[in-house]
């Protein structure tokens, strides 16, 4: 009988992997394993048995073959920056670190498309694109060290750019859990000239891609993808609207969005505004805490991009529209002198949660989508809940990226790892998530404990999902336990 991931089988796996990809690319030093055992989240750490670092598609295929043969679970990792336990391995599991696969393979400047490997970070893609007069779309809350490919795969439709939508990844190469290489969309047809064309009307592209969106490494390894880049404009300006009345937030956001002018748009509550628009000085956390009470309840921030004359017209149109509803277009945030400079820099090279975690040492996130109208209600409920359990409302940050249809919301609770807060926050997490679900929050990416919350309410959907998992990954070697809280299929 073969027992999943026993020490003997893992030893054999290490031996085979070392022969296939070189022993310097199979890491077993305890200090290095420890680094991969945890993330910024509240998820309990788990030490991997080894880290394998393949450098090519063929090497990944070999690793997958051995994992199947020896029933060793593997967890793909591209940037390693996700923060809800997505890359924490199961016992005796192996980390498949794809950072060595970090090449931009091709670019079509006229089409604004680049073909990238999973190890390409946002910073790298941004620098590469800028040399060709283009820019990469980066989500403001992520660190620039996140993998562009893995993030685009994971975010749609959680994150969206108000002007460009959420599907930035068009066609891709996937290594299925049995090692089969699959190309989606036009890439599947070598004779077709434009390998990146994504056609929703075709079952070969959109439909196929969706199976791997947000699959958290459970259905295969994405080894390449064509991603959209955008032009660099002559003029880029940042603007702000401050809002103190919850009832006006939806109206303001909608009016600005519906003009279809802003290219990047983010809404912050006062806590996240303080964290976002403050410089990372040694005093960062302390200064932030002092700032929060003096800031407006909400800050709506957006960029306008285009030719000088075009931007001028947009500015006057938006200013007029806002004036009509009693608001002003600002080019700075009162009390935050560097807001403009920081916003323009963050939309290209984001600092992400490592910066915000400096406020109280750590920060946990509840990501969901909801109607923009419901945001203030959910926010108030969360603040009350947090206060009832002895936390300050100054620890509750909210960042929203509005898209055409919904608000994409990240509720962030800052906490301190050194005092007894960790257990308390961990215990509250599920309860808060459940309460917010009742109020209209939808967890479109049910990570970790949220999987239980969501799938227990959608039995039929969950059964079909498990059927897909069983069909594609009969040995259950690909990042087990991510789609469910148990290892059973
Ligand atoms: C507004 C916002 C909110 C966010 N909220 C959260 C959040 O709440 N929790 C969170 O964890 N992240 C969150 N993210 C991060 C994001 O969704 C991705 O998890 C992250 O950007 C992935 O980048 P990474 O390179 O660090 O991936 P990694 O940390 O390396 O991996 C992320 C997940 O994808 C899988 N994976 C990685 N590479 C591949 C690959 N090549 N093929 C197949 N599977 C792969 C991994 O196994 C893992 O499950 C948020 C981002 C934004 C912008």
Locate predicted features.
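General beta-strand structural signal in soluble alpha/beta enzymes
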Residues: 26-30, 53-54, 74-78, 96-98, ...
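Conserved glycine-rich FAD pyrophosphate-binding loop
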Residues: 41-42, 46-47, 72, 79, ...
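Helix N-cap motif at beta-to-alpha junctions
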Residues: 57, 245-247, 304-311, 371-375, ...
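FAD-binding subdomain of flavoenzyme oxidoreductases
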Residues: 104-107, 116-256
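A conserved active-site cap/scaffold subdomain adjacent to cofactor or substrate pockets
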Residues: 236, 242, 291-329
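Short amphipathic alpha-helix segments
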Residues: 248-284, 375-391, 425-432
């Amino acid at each position: 009988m073969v027992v999943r991931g026993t020490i003997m089988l893992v030893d054999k796996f290490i031996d085979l992997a070392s022969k296939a990809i070189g022993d310097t690319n199979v890491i077993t030093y305890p200090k290095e394993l420890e680094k991969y055992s945890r993330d910024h989240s509240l998820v309990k750490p788990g030490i991997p048995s080894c880290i394998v670092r393949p450098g090519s598609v063929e090497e990944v295929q070999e690793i997958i073959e051995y994992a199947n043969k020896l029933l060793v679970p593997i967890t793909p990792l591209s940037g390693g920056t996700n923060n809800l336990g997505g890359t924490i391995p199961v016992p005796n599991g192996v980390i498949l670190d794809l950072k060595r696969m970090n090449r931009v393979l091709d670019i079509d400047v006229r089409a604004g498309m680049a073909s990238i490997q999973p190890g390409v970070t946002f910073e790298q893609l941004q620098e590469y694109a800028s040399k060709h007069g283009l820019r990469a779309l980066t989500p403001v809350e992520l660190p620039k060290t996140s993998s562009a490919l893995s993030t685009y795969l994971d975010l749609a439709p959680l994150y969206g750019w108000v002007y460009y939508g959420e599907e930035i990844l068009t066609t891709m190469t996937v290594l299925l859990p049995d090692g089969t290489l699959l190309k989606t969309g036009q890439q599947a047809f070598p004779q077709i000239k434009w390998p990146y064309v994504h056609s929703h009307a075709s079952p070969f592209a959109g439909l196929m891609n969706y199976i791997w969106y947000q699959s958290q490494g459970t259905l295969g390894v994405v080894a390449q993808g064509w991603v959209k880049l955008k032009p660099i404009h002559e003029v880029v300006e940042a603007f702000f609207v401050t809002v103190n009345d919850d009832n006006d937030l939806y109206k303001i956001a909608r009016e600005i969005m519906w003009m279809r002018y802003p290219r990047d748009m983010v809404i912050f509550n006062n806590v996240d505004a303080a964290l976002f628009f403050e410089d990372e000085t040694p005093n960062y956390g302390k200064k932030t805490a002092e700032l929060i009470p003096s800031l407006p309840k909400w800050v709506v921030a957006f960029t306008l991009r285009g030719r000088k004359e075009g931007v001028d017209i947009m500015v006057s149109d938006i200013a007029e529209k806002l004036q009509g509803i009693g608001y002003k277009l600002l080019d700075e945030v009162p009390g935050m002198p560097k807001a403009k400079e920081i916003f323009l820099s963050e939309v290209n090279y984001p600092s992400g949660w490592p910066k915000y975690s400096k406020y109280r040492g750590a920060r946990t996130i509840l990501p969901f989508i909801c109607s923009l109208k419901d945001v203030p209600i959910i926010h108030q409920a969360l603040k009350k809940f947090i206060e009832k359990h002895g936390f300050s409302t100054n620890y509750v940050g909210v960042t929203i990226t509005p898209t055409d249809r919904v608000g994409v919301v990240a509720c962030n609770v800052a906490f301190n790892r050194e005092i007894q807060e960790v257990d308390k926050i961990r215990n509250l997490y599920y309860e808060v998530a459940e309460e917010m679900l009742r109020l209209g929050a939808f967890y479109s990416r049910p990570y970790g404990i949220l999987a239980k919350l969501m799938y227990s309410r959608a039995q039929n959907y969950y059964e079909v999902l498990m059927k897909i998992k069983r069909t594609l990954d009969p040995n259950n070697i690909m990042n087990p336990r991510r789609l469910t809280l148990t290892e059973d299929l």
